[in-house]
Amino acid sequence: RPVRDPAYRPLLFYCIIGGLTGGFASPFLSVYELRVLGLSHTFITSVGVVSAVVGMAGSWVWGRLADRTAWNCVIWLTAFLNLSCTLGWSFVRPSFAHLVAPVLIVVAAGCAGGASLASTNLQFALSPESGKTAYFGVTAAMSSIATCTSAAVGTAIQPMLEKSMGDSSISLLFFVAGIGGFANLIINGRKLPSVT
């Protein structure tokens, strides 16, 4: 039913395509940070702690912004920042990774809570009173399947690319994921209704 619902379908497609683009490079982030960029476990863990705090604060900030604007506005802003971070990973090099990586990690974490809040609120607002659980379930299932499928494809492609591109193969995956995410935001994100 969610697929056939014209009011809900733009959000469903946005979530599914977002899963496809989001899952493509995400399995490689830790490998990229450690093996390619040469960041230490201690460094990554320390930045992870900071990003967790920023993520909690981000949820509050994005919620306040949604109160003043609309949830689709929060999705656009958080997606823009998060996709900029994804794309940014493709340009990070070991010589300046210790300066740029924390920014990318913290900004992405700060956006995660807002994106989740916005998506959940849009799903709630756009689904019918009698079918909210089914709509939420279908959206979560289809997005998860898309994310897992995309991760599997990325994992299959990366070793083949590595033979000719070396460590740049992971950078290419981040680039493709970022561009695909921006395409989704431009094509499907603009169709999201304004809901407060």
Predicted regions mapped to residue ranges:
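Hydrophobic core of transmembrane alpha-helices in multi-pass small-molecule transporters
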Residues: 98-115
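C-terminal ends and interior cores of transmembrane alpha-helices
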Residues: 80-96
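A membrane-interface helix-boundary motif in multi-pass transporters
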Residues: 158-180
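Multi-pass alpha-helical transporter architecture, strongest
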Residues: 175-196
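Helix-to-loop junctions at the C-terminal end of transmembrane segments
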Residues: 58-71, 158, 162
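Short amphipathic helix-loop junctions that connect adjacent transmembrane helices
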Residues: 27-44
